Amino acid sequence: MARIAGVDLPRDKRVEIALTYLYGIGLSRSHEILDATGVSPDVRVKDLSDEDALKLRTYIDENYEIEGDLRRWEAMNIKRLGDIGTYRGRRHRQGLPVRGQRTRTNARTRRGRRLTVAGKKKTPAKK
């Protein structure tokens, strides 16, 4: 089983797809890596030779920030925005959309589930 940056790649998938299971590597970057290392994108992970797996592992470790390092870098950037008091940092802290989207309607992903506010109860009419 190929293990890169602490992540087990799925054995039955093609290498070009399996590399996208690493945080920070998408399909286009996967193609770049395979072209640079000379590994065929059509080979399955279970059929990958130890030599090819080692080539992939060393190339990725030397040239890309992935997984924990990338997550830590992103978290530090967001924290930095909050520390210097920017509008974007404040929006991150409040859990609201950061890039100017409207929030009166929509923005459900960032704001969470709807909380219904109980309406004023009607009192029975007096006779």
From Swiss-Prot:
Stored SUPFAM superfamilies: S13-like H2TH domain
Gene3D superfamilies cross-referenced by the UniProt entry: 1.10.8.50, 30s ribosomal protein s13, domain 2 (4.10.910.10)
Keyword Glycosyltransferase on entry: no
Compositionally biased spans, kind Basic residues: 101-127
Keywords: Ribonucleoprotein, Ribosomal protein, RNA-binding, rRNA-binding, tRNA-binding
Function recorded in the entry: Located at the top of the head of the 30S subunit, it contacts several helices of the 16S rRNA. In the 70S ribosome it contacts the 23S rRNA (bridge B1a) and protein L5 of the 50S subunit (bridge B1b), connecting the 2 subunits; these bridges are implicated in subunit movement. Contacts the tRNAs in the A and P-sites.
Subunit structure: Part of the 30S ribosomal subunit. Forms a loose heterodimer with protein S19. Forms two bridges to the 50S subunit in the 70S ribosome.
Protein name: Small ribosomal subunit protein uS13
Organism: Synechocystis sp. (strain ATCC 27184 / PCC 6803 / Kazusa)
